[in-house]
Amino acid sequence: MIEKIWSGESPLWRLLLPLSWLYGLVSGAIRLCYKLKLKRAWRAPIPVVVVGNLTAGGNGKTPVVVWLVEQLQQRGIRVGVVSRGYGGKAESYPLLLSADTTTAQAGDEPVLIYQRTGAPVAVSPVRSDAVKAILAQHPDVQIIVTDDGLQHYRLARDVEIVVIDGVRRFGNGWWLPAGPMRERAGRLKSVDAVIVNGGVPRSGEIPMHLLPGQAVNLRTGTRCDVAQLEHVVTIAGIGHPPRFFATLKMCGVQPEKCVPLADHQSLNHADVSALVSAGQTLVMTEKDAVKCRAFAEENWWYLPVDAQLSGDELAKLLAQLTSLASGH
């Protein structure tokens, strides 16, 4: 229902307009206060790059963060990552991730980024505290990438990157809750780069698509072509589950059942195993896998996806980030 409201297919969005006006007024006032320096943002001693969204819901932001960190690492740059840690609750903040950190403590996305990149990752509701925690333990870090936080103006940033869904784009264009917007589309004029996940990119936008890899068994780490798996049941606890289901079908899988879950939803063995009958195979996202690995069964698999970006604007962005980081 929410997708129909945000896309404009359902007229119910009109009933929510008063709340959207209030949301827009408050969010605009907050940004203006920082712009006029009525509120002061904390500036890190090294460059900060924000990778965020203008809309609620999954746009492929986390794969972009992983891709960006890996690209900078390949250029010899030491990168740190900070996040709010949605879906997690640590005993205290900031929390610097280690191999023992669970998704219950840090959230699924920070754990995934840490496992994929090996970069220092810290979470905190106050992102400046997360930056300080990284620099205290890793003073050689040259640049910080913040996963989400475009609207977290308390942390000053040097580069802003926005990821948008190239198919859904901005829906009906209204602020939450009548529409999907955290900020209006005009905000794109002030950011440094716009990455478009799928669809047809417009002039100046960086095209991106998600490339699926081989399926990975949660218990053994064995890899195989996902199309070889039979009697598949799939779950997806991401911002936009239909994208993952469509990816599986593109890979030649016809799931017997597709189960969308809430983004950042906590998972346990009883709930997940109840979704799979005898003889069926469970396939999930990598983001779900980091929550399920500790109690996974033999027939549980995940399908990793990697961001693939291209174009002249991408080369300019990487050159800009490399230059910024090299100065520190």
UniProtKB/Swiss-Prot annotation:
InterPro entries noted in UniProt: LpxK, P-loop_NTPase
Pathway membership: Glycolipid biosynthesis; lipid IV(A) biosynthesis; lipid IV(A) from (3R)-3-hydroxytetradecanoyl-[acyl-carrier-protein] and UDP-N-acetyl-alpha-D-glucosamine: step 6/6
E.C. number: 2.7.1.130
Highest taxon listed in the record's lineage: Bacteria
Known catalytic reactions: a lipid A disaccharide + ATP = a lipid IVA + ADP + H(+)
One term of GO molecular function: ATP binding
Binding site for ATP: 55-62
Family per similarity comment: Belongs to the LpxK family.
Role description: Transfers the gamma-phosphate of ATP to the 4'-position of a tetraacyldisaccharide 1-phosphate intermediate (termed DS-1-P) to form tetraacyldisaccharide 1,4'-bis-phosphate (lipid IVA).
HAMAP family documented for this protein: LpxK
Classification via NCBIfam families: lpxK
Entry protein name: Tetraacyldisaccharide 4'-kinase
Naturally occurring in which organism (per UniProt): Escherichia coli O81 (strain ED1a)
